[in-house]
Amino acid sequence: MHLTGPTLLSLLAALLVSLGLLLWYPTKTRTKDKLLKDLNTLKINTVNLLNQVLKTDTTKLVDFHIANVHCDGIIDRLLSPDELAQLYHKDYPLYKRLVGCGYTKTVGLLHGFALWASETKTRDVSSLKYFIDCISTLDWKEPNLFAGFHTTESKVKKCIV
């Protein structure tokens, strides 16, 4: 069988496209897996912190309020609240995609629960319930919610009693 120039080029192009897809797909999957692993670790650490403060198991409570993130490899790590606020100005399209896939709300709530555990004075379930009711009213799309997350002016911190 004798291959002509155009046929050979077509086969070579198809081979390169296939190879590119084979190399790209696992990278995207690894990125998604890394983010999910990091989120799960943060969730476990948050639950452990809340359990220490409240002296009760909060796993179901946190699982109920923390939605699954479906970002499909958009980002491969957890961002701090300050990094999320900066991202809005540095890469607005990426920020909007993170809002759309639930990333900002999930990461914001996890950081918020950790902040509550370290800042609450009453250390009881009613204080946590008040906090949850308060942060449930927040719009996790707004970048100013993440700017100054740990300051007294923070909307999240104002929910802590």
Curated annotation (Swiss-Prot):
Keyword tags: Membrane, Transmembrane, Transmembrane helix
Residue stretches spanning the membrane: 5-25
Superkingdom: Viruses
Mode of membrane association: Single-pass membrane protein
Gene Ontology CC entries for this record: membrane
Protein's cellular compartments: Membrane
Family, similarity comment: Belongs to the IIV-6 203L/325L family.
Name by which UniProt lists this protein: Uncharacterized protein 085L
